[in-house]
Amino acid sequence: MALLLEYLPIIAFFVFYKLADIYVATGVLMVGTVLQILALKLLKQPITTRHWVILAVVMLFGAVTLLLRDDWFIKMKVSVVYVAIALMLLGGLIWKKRSPIQAMMGKDIKLPDTAWSRLTYAWIIFCLALAAVNLYIAEFWSQEAWVNFKVFGILGISLVFTIGTGFYMYHHAIDEETQD
């Protein structure tokens, strides 16, 4: 259920882009993102900082897109979100001296501190790379190509990177039974 809630706004965006246009799809994305937060609250699911950042950026860039009737702003939202995530991860490493990924997953998965740091830097680079690729596609490709990249390209690339992250974590996991 949580996975469906996670992707429902982007699925709705894609469907309404195909049925109408980028502006209708943007409005649907805005409403869908608000409904996502409300559903998480009703289902007593955790609402993370990432959810709030995405909500704020969707509302800001969506509103400007609709007010100015300029799709450039909603296209930039993707890059802004990925840069914000990269900055939050980097900020955690710099100011808290601890990987934010470790803070989220460290209770369940035991890795050496160096592995957590490398993993966090990998995610920072990944987010910045996605932001840059989005900027390129938004600027030089058609609107339809950008929508397809946003929905399918980013999802596919993220899935592959997440699977790679899982393999990395498995390879570096500390077996607590053999440590005793």
UniProtKB/Swiss-Prot annotation:
Subcellular location, principal: membrane
Mode of membrane association: Multi-pass membrane protein
Transmembrane segments: 10-30, 47-67, 74-94, 121-141, 151-171
Gene Ontology CC, one term: plasma membrane
Cross-referenced InterPro entries: YciB (IPR006008)
Subcellular location: Cell inner membrane
Keywords tagged on the record: Cell inner membrane, Cell membrane, Membrane, Transmembrane, Transmembrane helix
Family: Belongs to the YciB family.
NCBIfam families: ispZ
Protein role: Plays a role in cell envelope biogenesis, maintenance of cell envelope integrity and membrane homeostasis.
Protein's UniProt name: Inner membrane-spanning protein YciB
Native source species: Idiomarina loihiensis (strain ATCC BAA-735 / DSM 15497 / L2-TR)
